[in-house]
């Protein structure tokens, strides 16, 4: 009998704690100071508003997303509803990534590269959350 399943079982709580606490802290930060997120979301929100009438402000959308990430991050960190929490976090990261790391719009090569790295990092985070949801 291999020890791999046992080792995975022992690592799962630590992985959830590390992953979830990151989202909890960052989401809470957005709730406390939504301004930078509102600025980052402006272009994406403007594009959405061209297609759909939204009865909420950009700041409300950013705050709700921050609250969602904080709450689901905390749940994941505590091991409560981990699959659902991971799935919701992955879903919330898609618009966050598209709003915050629009590397394809950057003209400065250095800024473009930095945003591309952050975009790819977020994609990896989404992949990790999906993996956590399946595990």
Per-segment meaning from a language model:
Residues 1-135:
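Short amphipathic, positively biased membrane-proximal segments
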